[in-house]
Amino acid sequence: MRIALIGEFSLLHNYLKEGLINKGHNVTLFSNGDGWKKMPSDYKLYNTGRKGIKRIYDFYIEPLYRFKKIKGYDIVQLISPLVFSSFINNKIIRALKKNNKHLVLMAAGNDYATVTAYKEGILKHIFDYDKEHLIKYDEKTLKGRLKIRDEKEVLDLVDLVIPTSYIYKVGYKNNPKVSNVIPLPINLAKVEYIQNKVIDKIVFFHGLNRELAKGTFFIRGAMEKLKENYPNDVEIIIDGHLPYDEYIKIIGKTNVILDQCCDYDYGMNACVSMARGKVVMCCSTKEALKEIDQESSPVIPISANIDDIYEKLVSIVNKRNEIENMGFQSRKYVEKVHDCNIIAEKYLEAWGRL
């Protein structure tokens, strides 16, 4: 098949692309590298860096002209409903729908469907500390109404919606186009497993990115309390907004990753960390695991509560001799559930039913 993947979140489309290529398919990735993360892509969505009239051309005119010429793909998959600027997004997507065989939406971010499920009380707590995201979909504002309108039109255009986790499946539960959850893909050939040895102090790391959504306030509070009470046993690193290569360097020296505490499920950062043999503290609920046919995971579940996180940090300190084996179990879990070759096959099966 000839496949176009449009947009990127934390290497999700990169790893899916690599799995699909391993299956013998022709895949092209269009993205701007997920912003400051600078992730690889075959072609940019739009050029950045210029100002004035040139910026208007780069941001609006050129991509509209170029993507109208993207034709003849068997599958065009969007990583979110709004990949381009709001002024041209739906114009481009209508052209992609017209000029290619099938148009698919990957549900991998907190779009209007997820916000609606939260407002209706179906999803709990995920935006309790991230009210800024809710404002983007405020129906009392013109900007919010236009954003909702544009997303709804994209949903009308796509042939299939593929959720990557429980909350996105719940968000689209009333949409007949939604498929079963397909787990996140990881290219294990590119993510090296290294024994998680504790050399001196246990190193704990929390990466700063979308702090309100991830619950950084609670994670930071617990980590600082741990450092205060166990100064000779632990090192804590709280840093962020790093290019992916720099982020991976920090991961290399870390024993335990604290990712997020205000969700139902773990994401790409947690998956990559587990694949590298790290102990991961994150969200991992029974509902989310059930959606990917798993009864348990090696993820240590945490919630938006400083005391809860702190107690689990102390438990790890008291089990430092088990950290290496815990990291090994993390890797084995990713090999079983998230191998990009297995995930690529699941996407091919979903697309094949169109």
What are these regions (language model features)?
Residues 139-179, 221:
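A short, active-site helix/loop in glycosyltransferases that binds the activated sugar's phosphate group
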Residues 279-284:
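Short hydrophobic beta-strand element within catalytic cores of glycosyltransferases
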Residues 2-6, 67-88, 102-105, 256, ...:
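Short N-terminal targeting/anchoring amphipathic segment
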Residues 39-47, 105-144, 285:
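Acceptor-binding helix/loop patch of EC 2.4 sugar-transfer enzymes
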Residues 320-352:
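A charged, aromatic-enriched C-terminal amphipathic alpha-helix characteristic of glycosyltransferases
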Residues 252-265, 278:
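Acidic donor-binding loop of glycosyltransferase active sites
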Residues 178-214, 220:
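Conserved donor-binding/catalytic core segment of Leloir-type glycosyltransferases
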